[in-house]
């Protein structure tokens, strides 16, 4: 029996991840039983990865307008934010978790390629890449294999494509052992009048496929990303796409030149679900905007690289480096000429129609004829409101010992050696961060990466962040903190936070406790974004990040990853994070209630994350951001670095070490009225929010303190930057830390390589 002759039944639908109710709904929409090609189309378009059917009801609660947004969330391939001078920033973050779990190198590489295509299909040139990675314990040999593959995949693709990888973060937690997270973010710059919409309109306008030929790689990749991982997932390596960064580089240049012709009407990347998603979504946008639309294509015209491909396979292929273009009728040859110049395929495969359907022909037959709106989010795709029920983590209480029994020198070195704290230089040295010559500082020298915008004095700051341990302990607070820390990092550079994108990584949404984590963390994100006036431009939801290995269920920590951009009006105001001058005063901004809950120290020393996330005061955070920007504009600061993972001692040590060309030490004197037996542990290692360590010339201190007072923010002078070989920290005039800077640096810079057993890779 031919593929096209299959008589579709409920069994086929269930094998495609569709429920009986959804199959019935499809039959009602079509007025008949779907063909196998139509079933494949519905299965990917109604998958969680494409339809957000389990998440959209919650996502709609996020602030999606305001600020400098030029597009609403979900309206286009990526968010678009006005930065003045007729320029806009396009940016987006997405996940490639499941592919990276079974094929780490290609999974990560194609994640990078896909997110860059989302940016340049809007007419923007990608100028920076970021990534956020989560792995299991580095003690596990398979985790080390995954780390190696993912890092090489990101580096090889990004370096070859010619876009700098400027920032990111990596955490190691047991819960990610079988299900790593690979979240990639791209940032691009575009002139307002050169932006392109992912919309099909204009009856009779030709539809072109451009880029690589279509193969069988990645078929059902979207569905694969919408189910739990298991041992059987290893068999789904064909669902992992294969990338070619050199082909994508040619595609980028050809596409930007084609846009310059003025004949590109609409443009969309072929990412998840390939030709299916691009034809469906572009048609639906055209109908929504203009009241009429649709696309008809002939698959016999699609360049394929494997013989005998069925319509089902061609429609669902996720072969990389492909895009769909709607051209102005009569000018398609002009566009084809541009692509031929760059040695990139460009072929007319159909046209825009006026019957509001996606119609697919193959070998002289219509194999799919579906109302476009029925396929997409906000149209006919199902929307579910799942049960949410809180299930507090059963974490043990920390059986803390008295400060008097502890050696804080040893504890400080041990904490700096933790994989979650230690330098990630082994990772970022594999990435080219300086290509395009716009990156203003080396990796790690600022709290957020900053890219210069050529032709202006402006810079764009960017950061990704999420401490999933906080979200696990308290989803509402954790969601707030993820946004707050991104904004704090951006403000530390002197930039003003503008907007966010998000990548929401969670377990199975059908489990009430998981859906509770999802809803509450999104609520926290929304509250923070409203307070900071940083609207949400869009993003990605990745559910089903749970694995079953040898019958044992393993769920990831809930990880709502935030990607944020900010604007630095004058790059001369850029503030670094490291000590720069001996004799500078060290100031501590912010004075919250100290707690060890959620801290890396508590996990290291007492084997528990505690009972709650640190508290966060959003109004305090907003004032902190405004103050940091004001201090930068008045050029009062030499450095600013927030207190986060590891607490105050780690923040001070990082400020001392991160400028490897000229490391400087510190003499810090703290006071503490807390008489408890664990007060020193709290003061050194608490990850309490809303704090920043500043350094400034002595003559600037009075002005800084006066400005902090104007913003009603507590600030204290805690010490001095010194050009010596040891760091020293005293509490109530008793020295509790005294370490050679060389020992501190060795612990910090070599621990990750040791933990990953790099000599064995």
From Swiss-Prot:
Amino-acid positions noted as binding ATP in the UniProt annotation, renumbered to this chain: 52, 92, 502, 539
UniProt-listed Gene3D superfamilies: PurM-like C-terminal domain, PurM-like, N-terminal domain
Entry keywords, A to Z: ATP-binding, Cytoplasm, Ligase, Magnesium, Metal-binding, Nucleotide-binding, Purine biosynthesis
Record localization: Cytoplasm
Amino acids binding Mg(2+) 2: 118, 269
E.C. designation(s): 6.3.5.3
Binding site for substrate: 95-98, 117, 241, 318-320, 542
Protein's GO biological process: 'de novo' IMP biosynthetic process
Active site: 49, 96
GO molecular function, a single term: ATP binding
Pathway info: Purine metabolism; IMP biosynthesis via de novo pathway; 5-amino-1-(5-phospho-D-ribosyl)imidazole from N(2)-formyl-N(1)-(5-phospho-D-ribosyl)glycinamide: step 1/2
Chain residues that bind Mg(2+) 1: 94, 540
Catalytic activity field: N(2)-formyl-N(1)-(5-phospho-beta-D-ribosyl)glycinamide + L-glutamine + ATP + H2O = 2-formamido-N(1)-(5-O-phospho-beta-D-ribosyl)acetamidine + L-glutamate + ADP + phosphate + H(+)
GO CC terms in record: cytoplasm
Protein role: Part of the phosphoribosylformylglycinamidine synthase complex involved in the purines biosynthetic pathway. Catalyzes the ATP-dependent conversion of formylglycinamide ribonucleotide (FGAR) and glutamine to yield formylglycinamidine ribonucleotide (FGAM) and glutamate. The FGAM synthase complex is composed of three subunits. PurQ produces an ammonia molecule by converting glutamine to glutamate. PurL transfers the ammonia molecule to FGAR to form FGAM in an ATP-dependent manner.
Assembly and interaction partners: Monomer. Part of the FGAM synthase complex composed of 1 PurL, 1 PurQ and 2 PurS subunits.
Family: Belongs to the FGAMS family.
Protein's name in the database: Phosphoribosylformylglycinamidine synthase subunit PurL
Organism for this UniProt entry: Chlorobium chlorochromatii (strain CaD3)
Lineage: Bacteria, Pseudomonadati, Chlorobiota, Chlorobiia, Chlorobiales
Gene coding for it: purL
């Amino acid at each position: 029996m031919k593929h096209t002759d299959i008589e579709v039944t409920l069994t086929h639908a269930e094998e495609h991840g569709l429920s009986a109710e959804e199959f019935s709904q499809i039959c009602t929409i079509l007025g008949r039983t779907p063909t196998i090609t139509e079933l494949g189309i519905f299965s990917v378009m109604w998958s969680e990865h494409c339809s957000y059917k389990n998440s959209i009801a919650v996502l709609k609660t996020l602030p999606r307008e305001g600020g400098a947004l030029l597009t609403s969330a979900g309206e286009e391939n990526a968010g678009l934010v006005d930065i003045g001078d007729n320029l806009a920033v396009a940016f987006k973050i997405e996940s490639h978790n499941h592919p990276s779990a079974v094929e780490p190198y290609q999974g990560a590489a194609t994640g990078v390629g896909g997110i860059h295509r989302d940016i340049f299909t809007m007419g923007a040139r990608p100028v920076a890449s970021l990534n956020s990675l989560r792995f299991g314990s580095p003690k596990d040999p398979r985790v080390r294999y995954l780390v190696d593959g993912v890092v090489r995949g990101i580096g090889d693709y990004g370096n070859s494509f010619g876009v700098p990888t400027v920032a990111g973060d990596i955490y190691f937690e047991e819960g990610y052992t079988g299900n790593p997270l690979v979240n990639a973010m791209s940032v691009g710059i575009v002139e307002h009048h050169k932006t392109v919409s992912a919309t099909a309109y204009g009856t009779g306008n030709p539809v072109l496929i451009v880029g690589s030929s279509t193969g069988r790689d990645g078929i059902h990749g979207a569905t694969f990303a919408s189910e739990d991982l298991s041992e059987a997932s290893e068999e789904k390596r064909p669902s992992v796409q294969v990338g070619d960064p050199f082909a994508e580089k040619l595609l980028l240049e050809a596409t930007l030149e084609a846009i310059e012709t003025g004949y590109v009407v609409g443009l969309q990347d072929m990412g998840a679900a390939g030709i299916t998603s691009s034809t469906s979504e572009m048609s639906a946008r055209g109908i929504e905007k203009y009241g009429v639309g649709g696309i008809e294509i002939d698959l016999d015209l699609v360049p394929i690289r494997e013989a005998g491909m069925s319509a089902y396979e061609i429609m669902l292929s996720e072969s990389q480096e492909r895009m769909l273009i709607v051209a102005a009728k009569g000018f398609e040859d002009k566009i084809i000429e541009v692509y031929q110049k760059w040695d990139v395929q460009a072929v007319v495969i159909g046209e825009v129609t006026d019957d509001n359907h996606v119609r697919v022909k193959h070998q002289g037959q219509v194999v799919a004829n579906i109302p476009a709106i029925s396929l997409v989010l906000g149209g006919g795709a199902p929307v579910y409101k799942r049960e949410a029920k809180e299930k507090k983590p059963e974490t043990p209480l920390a059986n803390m010992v008295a400060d008097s029994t502890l050696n804080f020198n040893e504890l400080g070195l041990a904490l700096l050696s933790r994989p979650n704290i230690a330098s990630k230089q082994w990772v970022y040295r594999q990435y080219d961060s300086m290509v395009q010559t716009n990156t203003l500082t080396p990796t790690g020298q600022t709290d957020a990466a900053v890219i210069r915008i050529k032709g202006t004095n402006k810079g764009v700051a960017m950061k990704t962040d999420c401490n999933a341990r906080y979200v696990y302990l308290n989803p509402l607070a954790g969601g707030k903190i993820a946004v707050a820390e991104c904004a704090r990092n951006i403000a530390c550079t002197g930039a003003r936070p503008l907007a966010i994108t998000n990548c929401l990584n969670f377990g199975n949404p059908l489990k009430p406790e998981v859906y509770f984590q999802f809803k509450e963390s999104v609520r926290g994100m929304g509250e923070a974004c409203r307070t900071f006036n940083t609207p949400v431009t869009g993003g990605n939801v990745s559910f089903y990040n749970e694995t079953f290995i040898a019958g044992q269920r393993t769920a990831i920590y809930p990880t709502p990853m935030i990607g944020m951009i900010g604007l630095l009006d004058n790059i001369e105001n850029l503030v670094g994070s490291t000590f720069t001058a001996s004799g500078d005063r060290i100031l501590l901004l912010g004075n919250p209630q100290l707690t060890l809950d959620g801290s890396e120290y508590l996990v290291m020393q007492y084997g528990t994350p505690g009972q709650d996330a640190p508290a966060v005061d959003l109004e305090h955070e907003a004032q902190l951001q405004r103050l940091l920007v004001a201090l930068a504009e008045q050029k009062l600061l030499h450095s600013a670095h927030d207190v986060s993972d590891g607490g105050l001692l780690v923040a001070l040590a990082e400020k001392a070490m991160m400028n490897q060309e000229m490391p400087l030490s510190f003499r810090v004197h703290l006071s503490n009225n807390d008489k408890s037996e664990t007060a020193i542990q709290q003061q050194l290692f608490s990850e309490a929010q809303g704090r920043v360590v500043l350094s400034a010339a002595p003559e600037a201190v009075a002005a800084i303190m006066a400005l902090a007072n104007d913003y009603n923010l507590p600030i204290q002078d805690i010490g001095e930057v010194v050009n010596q070989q040891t760091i020293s920290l005293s509490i109530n005039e008793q020295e509790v830390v005294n370490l050679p800077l060389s020992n501190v640096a060795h612990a910090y810079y070599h621990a990750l390589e040791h933990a990953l057993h790099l000599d064995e890779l």
